[in-house]
């Protein structure tokens, strides 16, 4: 029934298995891949006919995690998977980015890649094996895909690179880098680092590229046994159309790209396009070429004109040389009620970034395959259509917004203080108000400033820069702080974020082969210079965190109590903790470890709640005198509430210096008294005394009573002696 083909290899100390022919046989390509006990199914389906009226590759990648993969049932009311989680969106992008450049130019058939996590061993993250499985499925499918690709995760532990570290091993790593590419070239890098130098980052990229070569070889062996016949597809030859477009529009395009203002430049380019269309594909009359063909050729000519100009003259679209960063203006404290805010403007790219501090109640619960955990640092990126002078859809964030937000999150996250040092939930929101390239890096810069404005003690300011590359044969130009047009028309887009000490995040997307390690090294060194310049410009607004939190931010006080005292603070059914919250107005978060966070914008409320809790958990000292209240009387004594919520017994013999016949002769319920803590009996019961305390002054009269008893005994002794004489 099944024609199963299989490849196995030992990779990074664990077995990688690729299998096809048994599951999802109606898909164009399907591979079940296992790494350790993490298993995914990758499928590819591409329509037989192209999608009419489009000028882009209609590729969709969907990565989906199933709760059963980790032996869990989804939370929520419906108990089934719903909309994609942030991780599913991010991994979908991680798979998409290295495979998209490898489709043959001109492929317009709707293509969908679906990767489903079937099993998760909680050791091997499914993202790497998902990328490998998707690559294998595409290679088998027959679509014009110029792969395969390999992928690997690289950690950095004890100054040594580590291939595909487990989830547990990653906790001790100062680097989390994912790299993907073909046999000959790196195509994609995504990373977070703890201020590592550029040479370590580049070394990690090359280490990963070297060590995923066996995976590519295994996919090729599998394809030799199981690949489908390649689709019959011939890309459209645009050379004749391009020649015609160049003759009509080259001079005008060169003039259009001398305009430094984005909207003016776009208007000029549109005018050239209209002229070319009217000449080569008029709406009325005889057309020399198909309209769609002319549009595609015009895009190619646009790119060539810009690229030639940069390589020939060293001058860019907006007149800068290749190393110059656009003018920067940084402002902080721009919103009066926000906890921290910044407006970061770099050329025609602008981000309004706001930092908000919250309490434990504001932590985000993440329901992942590895289990539910809390996230205390949130960074959200919004890209409204007005930022590029357009109208468009508004609503929930798209994949691009989630991806850019996560990139900025990775850049800032390594600089945040530890939770025990700064026990706040932090949310940063970046509103992109203008965009002409590098808005994610503007978000990094604005986030750094907004956090410092809020009083968050970042270890150092962090900045980011987007770099580009133009490569033609042996000639190349690395571009600092790229514009949107340079991003689209260039061969490499990579973003570097970091501090004066090192890199915290590196994202790289390479569109062509031929980019060598040396070119990447030049680009990273140039990015370092650009980052240093940006940090200097940011320092004009703020150099470090403000010494105090923002005026409207909540204050949080932390305290540690013994874990066996947590029940006493909470009380039966939460009675005690509710009373503290209601009477002080403070927010209180109690953790299983005994850490208590008390939050309020009012310092007096924090102090009142702190003292209340301290009185509950503190132990009374033997020999000390405390105020108390009679809560119950019995024949043998009275129970006194003292020292917060503690109750102890004053035995009838300890009520008063004189003999007491009846407890109620001395005290009644509700009486305010002063008691001395004598300690605990062998059963742990608290023993108190009233008779050794002056009920008026609170003075300890133990010695006075001893002296009186001694005097009484002396008088009795003298009386006996006198009677005997």
From Swiss-Prot:
BP-aspect Gene Ontology terms: mRNA catabolic process; RNA processing
Subcellular location: Cytoplasm
Binding site for Mg(2+): 487, 493
Residue segments, region Disordered: 697-725
Bias kind Basic and acidic residues: ranges: 701-719
Domain S1 motif span(s) in chain numbering: 623-691
Keywords for the protein's UniProt record, in alphabetical order: Cytoplasm, Magnesium, Metal-binding, Nucleotidyltransferase, RNA-binding, Transferase
Function: Involved in mRNA degradation. Catalyzes the phosphorolysis of single-stranded polyribonucleotides processively in the 3'- to 5'-direction.
Entry similarity comment: Belongs to the polyribonucleotide nucleotidyltransferase family.
Annotated protein name in UniProt: Polyribonucleotide nucleotidyltransferase
Species for this entry: Methylobacterium nodulans (strain LMG 21967 / CNCM I-2342 / ORS 2060)
Taxonomic classification: Bacteria, Pseudomonadati, Pseudomonadota, Alphaproteobacteria, Hyphomicrobiales
Gene symbol of the encoding locus: pnp
């Amino acid at each position: 029934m099944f024609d199963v083909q299989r490849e196995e290899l030992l990779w990074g100390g664990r077995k990688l298995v690729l299998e096809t022919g048994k599951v999802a046989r109606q898909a164009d390509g399907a591979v079940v891949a296992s790494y350790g006990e993490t298993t995914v199914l990758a499928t590819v389906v591409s329509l037989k006919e192209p999608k009419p009226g489009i000028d882009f590759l209609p590729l969709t990648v969907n990565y989906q995690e199933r709760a059963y993969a980790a032996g869990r049932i989804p939370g929520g009311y419906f108990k089934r998977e719903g909309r994609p989680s942030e991780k599913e969106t991010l991994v979908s992008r991680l798979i998409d980015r290295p495979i998209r450049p490898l489709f043959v130019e001109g492929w317009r058939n709707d293509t969908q890649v679906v990767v489903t996590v079937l099993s998760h061993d909680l050791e091997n993250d499914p993202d790497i094996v998902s990328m490998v499985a998707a690559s294998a499925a595409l290679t088998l499918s027959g679509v014009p895909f110029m792969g395969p690709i390999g992928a690997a995760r690289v950690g950095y532990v004890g100054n040594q690179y580590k291939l595909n570290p487990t989830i547990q091993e990653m906790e001790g790593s100062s680097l989390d880098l994912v790299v993907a590419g073909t046999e000959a070239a790196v195509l994609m890098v995504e990373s977070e680092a703890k201020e590592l130098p550029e040479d370590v980052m580049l070394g990690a990229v090359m280490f990963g590229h070297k060590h995923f070569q066996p995976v590519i070889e295994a996919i090729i062996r599998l394809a030799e046994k199981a690949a489908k016949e390649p689709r019959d597809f011939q890309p459209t030859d645009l050379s004749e159309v391009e020649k015609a477009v160049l003759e009509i529009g080259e001079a005008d395009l060169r003039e259009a790209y001398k305009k430094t203002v984005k909207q003016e430049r776009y208007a000029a380019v549109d005018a050239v396009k209209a002229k070319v269309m009217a000449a080569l594909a008029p709406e009325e009359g005889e057309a020399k070429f198909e309209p769609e063909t002319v549009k595609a050729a015009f895009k190619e000519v646009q790119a060539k004109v810009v690229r030639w100009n940069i390589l020939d003259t060293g001058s860019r679209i907006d007149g800068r040389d290749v190393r110059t960063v656009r003018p920067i203006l940084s402002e902080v404290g721009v919103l009066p009620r926000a906890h921290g805010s910044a407006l970061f403007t770099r050329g025609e790219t602008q981000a309004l970034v706001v930092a908000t501090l919250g309490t434990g109640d504001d932590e985000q619960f993440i329901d992942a395959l590895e289990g539910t955990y809390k996230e205390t640092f949130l960074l959200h990126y919004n890209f409204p259509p007005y930022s590029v002078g357009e109208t468009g859809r508004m609503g929930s964030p798209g994949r691009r917004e989630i991806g850019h937000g996560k990139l900025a999150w990775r850049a800032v996250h390594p600089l945040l203080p530890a939770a025990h040092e700064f026990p706040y939930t932090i949310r940063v929101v970046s509103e992109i108000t203008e965009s002409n390239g590098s808005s994610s890096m503007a978000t990094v810069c604005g986030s750094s400033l907004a956090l410092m404005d809020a009083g968050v003690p970042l270890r150092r300011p962090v900045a980011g820069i987007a770099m580009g590359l133009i490569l033609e044969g042996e000639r190349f130009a690395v571009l600092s702080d790229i514009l949107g047009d340079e991003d689209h028309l260039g061969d490499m887009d990579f973003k570097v974020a970091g501090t004066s000490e090192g890199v915290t995040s590196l994202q790289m997307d390479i569109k062509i082969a031929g980019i060598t390690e040396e070119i990447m090294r030049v680009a990273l060194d140039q990015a370092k210079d650009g980052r240093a310049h940006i940090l200097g410009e940011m320092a004009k607004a703020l150099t470090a965190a403000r010494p105090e939190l923002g005026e409207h931010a909540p204050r949080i006080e932390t305290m540690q109590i013994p874990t066996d005292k947590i029940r006493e603070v909470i009380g039966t059914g939460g009675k005690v903790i509710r009373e503290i919250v209601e009477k002080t107005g403070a927010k209180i978060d109690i953790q299983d470890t005994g850490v208590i966070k008390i939050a309020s914008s009012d310092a007096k409320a924090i102090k009142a709640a702190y003292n209340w809790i301290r009185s509950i958990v503190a132990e009374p000292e033997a020999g000390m005198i405390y105020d108390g209240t009679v809560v119950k009387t019995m024949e043998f004594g009275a129970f006194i509430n003292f020292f917060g919520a503690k109750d102890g017994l004053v035995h009838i013999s300890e009520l008063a210096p004189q003999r007491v016949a009846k407890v109620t002769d001395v005290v009644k319920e509700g009486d305010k008294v002063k008691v001395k803590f004598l300690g605990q009996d062998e059963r742990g019961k608290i023993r108190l005394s009233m008779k050794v305390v002056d009920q008026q002054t609170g003075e300890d009269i133990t010695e006075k009573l001893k002296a009186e008893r001694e005097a009484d005994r002396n008088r009795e002794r003298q009386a006996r002696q006198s009677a005997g004489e």
